[in-house]
Amino acid sequence: MSFRSIVRDVRDGFGSLSRRGFEVRILGHRRGKSHGAVHELHDPVPVIQSSCWASLPPELLRDIIERLEESEATWPSRKHVVACAGVCRTWREMCKEIVKNPELCGKITFPISLRQPGPRDGTMQCFIRRDKSTQTYYLYLSLGSAVLVDNGKFLLSAKRNWHATCTEYVISMNANNLSRSTNTNIGKLRSNFLGTKFVIYDTHTPYNATSDSQSGKTSRRFSNKGTAKHPCSTYSIANISYELNVFGTRGPRRMCCLMHSIPASSLEAGGTVPSQPDSILAHSLNESSFRSVSFSKSSVMDHSMHFSSAQFSDISIGDGPRIGGRVLSDDEECKETPLILQNKAPRWHEQLQCWCLNFRGRVTVASVKNFQLIAATQPAAGAPTPSQPVPPPPPEHDKVILQFGKVAKDMFTMDYHYPLSAFQAFAISLSSFDTKLACE
């Protein structure tokens, strides 16, 4: 029997198990509303695994998953690996052991991979399609070198919503349902009135959420008034700041990203991004997770917006890490220093008489939205002039972590790698679409 036949049989068997479990849950709800609620919270209905694939010998199961992982390396055939992880707990545990995260294997397989750091030794190439009529943005994983004809693998979507004092981008794993109440929403991006300061919110708890630092504060409200449901939270994981474009319309914008959820030590030898989810499948989110978050006018002035008063030069690493002009202590520097990203300084092109960045063929249309982000390891220097070229930075400082640029009308490429995740890179890229009233 071929591996594709095995996967097909497993998928059919898994579908019958899901239907059987659904029927059992329906019967449980018929017993009564109050009894059904207690039953749902404290006594989950077990699904009887009657499929013959659930009792395969471990050696045979390992061989099947390893062969499948090696042969189905790209999408859309990689969906068979996802199907195997959904058969039963035994298959899921085997997939967790064999299928590595994007940081190690350079592949996006499960939904949780969107929150995990990209590859260390490579680049995750993606592209974004913009639908101006609906103000919707779609992130795809590139499956080929020709971006304009590449259908890609859908990863995330974002819906732009205007408010009186700000703009919001709701980020979802669903390409069609972008309502605020869906359980596929995983975060959002919120701007100030001028479009110069942004905050990235995530529904996943960051590693420092329980600390007293600024990045650990959360927004909590109950999903429905008068109910005893568990509150849902969104966590501020990053701040983005844009400043006056000293290069005019011919150069990239000046931006800085303060990544609360990524420590600066993650770029050092042996460094890691903490608090990575153990589950390979996405945890089910509360259906009112975004409806429960308060974003009133007063909430705009929370800890996240304190970043708006800090100058670009204040958020640097010179005499010591500083945030908003305050130099961190030794203990804070050791425990809480976040990763700081800033845009790479362009070089002056004598023939074109303009500022240029080397996107290595991934960006083909000049746009003020184009940018490259690198780790900030020294104070931001003043604007270079044609007579005073910028001295080349050290190789480790010059490594591009995220680049974004235009290739056609409503088509943009987005390439990222460790320590950013697809969700974080997408949110940062979305900030470039917003109008910057005070930057140009």
From Swiss-Prot:
Report the protein name in the record. Answer: Tubby-like F-box protein 13
- What PANTHER family does the record point to? TUBBY-LIKE F-BOX PROTEIN 13, TUBBY-RELATED
SUPFAM superfamilies per the record?
Answer: F-box domain, Tubby C-terminal domain-like
The organs and tissues expressing this protein are described as: Ubiquitous.
Instruction: Give the originating organism.
Output: Oryza sativa subsp. japonica (Rice)
What high-level taxonomic lineage is stated for the organism? Eukaryota, Viridiplantae, Streptophyta, Embryophyta, Tracheophyta
Which superkingdom heads the taxonomic lineage of this protein's source? Eukaryota
What the record says about family reads: Belongs to the TUB family.
The cross-references to CDD domains, in alphabetical order and at most eight, read: F-box_AtTLP-like
Which residues belong to any copy of the F-box domain? 51-106
Q: Which InterPro entries match?
A: F-box-like_dom_sf (IPR036047), F-box_dom (IPR001810), Tubby-like_C (IPR025659), Tubby_C (IPR000007), Tubby_C_CS (IPR018066)
